[in-house]
């Protein structure tokens, strides 16, 4: 079973190492023979926690951050792929104080979807307004 790991790909996260972190995660997973699906999502706007790495678990996405390349091996040692405890563990992403108090409308999908994937956009009800308009 593949484990889904999210690492942001927007310019702010990339400028502080998100690409390097994503590559390190992929390399470490391969080294440990752990099958992962690495999704490059948009940032949730928590720049003080970037790169913010999220892991999809049965309870929801669990957040770790800010993650540096030097943290990746210890994240795997702590079983972060199933939400394991680690000094960078922040909890369920949706329960983080900064996000919990928000009702996002315009940016509702930011940090959740891959910003360049039409399949992801459609899966999260993208084009719903267009679909409704065309049916009338």
Feature locations, PLM:
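Feature of Fe-S/electron-transfer and energy-metabolism proteins
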Residues: 1-136
